[in-house]
From Swiss-Prot:
Substrate binds at L74, C75, H76, M110, E111. Gene3D superfamilies: Molybdopterin cofactor biosynthesis C (MoaC) domain. It catalyses: (8S)-3',8-cyclo-7,8-dihydroguanosine 5'-triphosphate = cyclic pyranopterin phosphate + diphosphate. This is Probable cyclic pyranopterin monophosphate synthase. Catalyzes the conversion of (8S)-3',8-cyclo-7,8-dihydroguanosine 5'-triphosphate to cyclic pyranopterin monophosphate (cPMP). The gene is moaC. It comes from Thermococcus kodakarensis (strain ATCC BAA-918 / JCM 12380 / KOD1) (Pyrococcus kodakaraensis (strain KOD1)). Belongs to the MoaC family.
Amino acid sequence: MKDLTHVDEKGVKMVEVGHKDVVFRKAVAKGRIRLKPETIELIKAGKTKKGNVIAAAQIAGILAVKKTPELIPLCHPIPLTGVDITFEFGDDYIEATCEVRAYYKTGVEMEALTGVSVALLTIWDMVKAVEKDENGQYPFTRIEDIRVVEKVKGEE
């Protein structure tokens, strides 16, 4: 079993990466939000009351990637070289993909996971009025399957 790198006998710590080489890093995370089919159609048609759902989710996700070390206390601030957030539509879901790139001493998986999570949360926020049932609940809406699907260390 591997040891935890952020915890030792003295408590919690930020891992020392000063000795590591600067290399290309990439992480891709995906996740889905389940929505009513009618909500998906409203988003595609650009007819939601709060505005362009996809553009807002992209901007929020990119901002979240940049803010990751402020949200997750033991993450290193990383000089990012690029972030892409894309979406694929299904009949009752939107799948978000967040790709993060950097040249640095440590990986960018947490940044990719944070970006995809906030992008999906932003979609929820922008469509919650049409997703609620008559009791103000969200019986169908859910965020699921957030995961890292690719990690690259080394050559681009």
